[in-house]
Amino acid sequence: MHTQVAIIGAGPAGLFLSHLLYREGIACVVLEARSRAYVEDRVRAGVLEQGTVDLMHELGLDQRLRRECMIDEAIDIRFGNGKLIHVHFPELVAGRVVTIYGQQEVVKDLIAARIADGAPIQFEAEVTALEGLENDRPTIRYRKDGTEHTLTCDIVAGCDGFHGVCRPAIPDGVLTTYDHVFPFGWLGILSESPPIRETTYANHDRGFALCSRRSPKISRHYVQVAPDEDAANWSDDRFWNELHVRMNDGDRSEIVEGRIFQKGVTPVRAFVAAPMRYGRLFLAGDAAHIVPPTGAKGLNLAVADVRVLARALTQFFRGGSMERLDRYSDTCLRRVWKVVRYSWFMTSLLHRFPEHSVFERNIQLGELDYLLSSRAGRLTIAENYVGLPLEDE
């Protein structure tokens, strides 16, 4: 079997790319190692930048999103004894907002629409080899239902995540990787409880905390813990008690407790691989970069990658020009490093670092005090939070 673009991975990057290519009449096949149920049930972040929502609208895939989403017009940052930084997006960035809609819901919508279009997604198709990536007709070998299959293509899009097969298929010595692991993790829970009014971050002497929304009836909360912490050590009561303390909700009147139905520890790290291309293989999304969750950027950065890639592929298949493909990596990496910078800034601003001296702690609090009084400082947070403009228009 031959196709123009082989997309490895049916996460947000691969699925958005498949729809962008379908719109342009470019043939593609999506290969996903996991089952459809597994892919659709993975709970991930749910903060969508304006540009991501706009793309779903352009593709005609936003009907359920419009019915079920929530809109965040602001975030709050708490610190000290009751100090509050209110970052109101419409006031600071010309009416732009962020949308709360779970990544798993985005994935469900994208999969359903692709299947309705009659476009192929091969679930439980494990890629076993990528060959000829430096040639103009790469070969992909994959296993499905116990049978070996071969797919040839003109372009391979590596959208299979941090632990996928695409990035390791690039020969040694080609990639430079940048990796930074922070000295803490996030203990996160999902609970059946109405969420707090605004997405709220907290910098407390005992550590970072975050209260966020998933739906009108589901809350997503986090507290900073040691990177090797075991979630089993945290009873539900212990978690709620710690969250109330870090959010300065001493009278327990603001954060509503409910049944916790998911609990786990997430590492906090940044990772970038450069370049994001080798021959006819183009990396996108988590296959190329991981950002700390503090900035809520992972899905949105993946969408930005594939928008750039889709335009480059359209130019290539329509006119034979490699010009946009040749600058794909540089274009994407400029945005990637800006997003890593912002996520690093928010992470450094809001967490307690075990190695910090009293001097460094006071610098952190001084930065928060500056943001409290500076519109320019709040503007910097707002324009990054709602999403930077796409460069490769």
PLM features: residue spans?
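Beta1/beta-strand and adjacent pyrophosphate-binding region of the FAD-binding site
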Residues: 1-13
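Conserved mid-domain beta->alpha element of the FAD-binding
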Residues: 10-23, 110, 158, 264-345
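Glycine-rich FAD pyrophosphate-binding loop
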Residues: 22-43
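Generic enzyme active-site microenvironment
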Residues: 30-31, 158, 202, 284
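Active-site-adjacent segment of FAD-dependent monooxygenases/related oxidoreductases
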Residues: 41-44, 49-117, 131
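Conserved FAD-binding catalytic core of PHBH/FMO-like flavoproteins
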Residues: 112, 119, 125-129, 134-264, ...
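C-terminal helical "tail/cap" subdomain of flavin- and related membrane-associated enzymes
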Residues: 296, 311-393
